[in-house]
Amino acid sequence: MKEKNIRSQNQLALNMGITKNQLSAILSEKFTPIKSNVEKLCEVLDIGFDEIMCLEDVNEKQLKFTNICSSNKDYIEHRDCTYKELSEYELNPRERNKNNKHIDISNVLAKRAYTCVELFAGAGGLALGLEKAGFKEVGLVEWDKYACDTLKLNRPDWNVIQGDIVKIAENGIKNYIDNNIEIDLLSGGYPCQAFSYAGKKLGLEDVRGTLFYSYAKILEELKPKVFLAENVRGLVSHDGGKTLKTMIDVFSEIGYNVKYEILKAVNYGVAQKRERVIIIGTRKDLSHVDFKFPKSFEYVATLRDALKNVPKSEGARYPERKKKVLDMVPPGGCWIDLPDEVARDYMGKSYYSGGGKRGMARRISWDEPCLTLTCSPAQKQTERCHPDETRPFTTREYARIQSFPDEWEFTGSVSQVYKQIGNAVPVKLGKAIGLSIVDYLNKIEKIYVTEEVAITEEEYVI
């Protein structure tokens, strides 16, 4: 800085055309600088990206990140990604797939139409993904009227069971589906609820009164080969990890071996940084085959990819005051990029607590995946503004980001449609998980067929 006659951060910020607050955010480890601001810093100091990343006064953690960024510089620049936001795990899919815990699903095909019952089906994101993977839905349980109408509209042949899952579990799920069909998969995402811990280890009857209990009772009744449960990533740490441990204990009591992993939708062709914890259970009598989660894809879909030629649709609008504020934010930016006095006024108390990370006044960049969509597109703490137009994403744009096909229609008011889409599992993520389950079931089928043939030949010889 001294070589450029810049003697303070104030002067550097002035030369860059930003506030000192914005510069502090760029230099801080707490925030993620957007590419345009890093480029401004390079321009003012008249040095390249590599030189900035190799400054001597970086700590060990920053140096480690330097090496990651330097080796992936072309990738980052092509995607217009934020540097700090992309961890080594995200930047090197080949490295994270070297272990044998994951399978390549690119050539997986179902040997037959595997059967599935889905609970908490919502608007069908997971069910549609599983259908694309090769599953046939035998029954879908959902409480919300509009979500049920959406399912019936798009798949008139699906057995949509609208009702209270507590009562359905009490009555027995087999009273609502074809009882002559063996179920291969039970899927669904029950809410994350805390349990009351009377003892050190809880069993099935100890979690009575929760929606998880209803899921577990139906699992116990159907005894499918596999179950799939998805939830928010916070389940892993919820109540100090006790909640997830209790669920695993209950699943084990019912007769299942359990694996779980946090999967990032962006790693499976979804233009969104949504993360979900995926719990897979395989029946203990089928433990001779090991289930593996799907490998990450070798590409990252961007918002530009997702919204190419998107059809027009309805959408929410910002109030005039909010619109004036967001007009000042560049693509990929957020409240950090606002003039200091505007940010202070707009954010209120949140300004002094760091502004809810980067969610407030956030405008998405075309050339990176979108942040996780919520049920309310204009909510202040989790704003997701269109890159070019100062407005929330429309309902069809929402659906595209969640990887729903354009022909999948939604029923209800605009707010109901946003809610259905925001709550959904991204279709492509559902398909990827589905294909990994198909691979497992294919191997089970192969073993059964081999054993049957061996027995038949032996009997024939005798």
Regions found by a protein language model. Name each.
Residues Q11, Q22, E51:
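Residues in the helix-turn-helix
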Residues R208-K273, V277-T282:
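Conserved Class I SAM-dependent methyltransferase catalytic core
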Residues Q62-V138, V250-E253, R276-Q416, Q420, ...:
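S-adenosyl-L-methionine-dependent DNA methyltransferase catalytic core
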Residues S36-E51:
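DNA major-groove recognition helix of helix-turn-helix/homeodomain DNA-binding modules
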Residues E51-T66:
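Short amphipathic recognition helices of helix-turn-helix/homeodomain-type DNA-binding modules
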Residues Y75, R79-K223, R233-S237, K242-L244:
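Core alpha/beta nucleotide-donor-binding catalytic domains of modification enzymes
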Residues G17-P33, L55-D57:
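Recognition helix of helix-turn-helix/homeodomain-like DNA-binding domains
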Residues M1-N15:
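Short basic helix-loop element that most often maps to the first helix and adjoining turn
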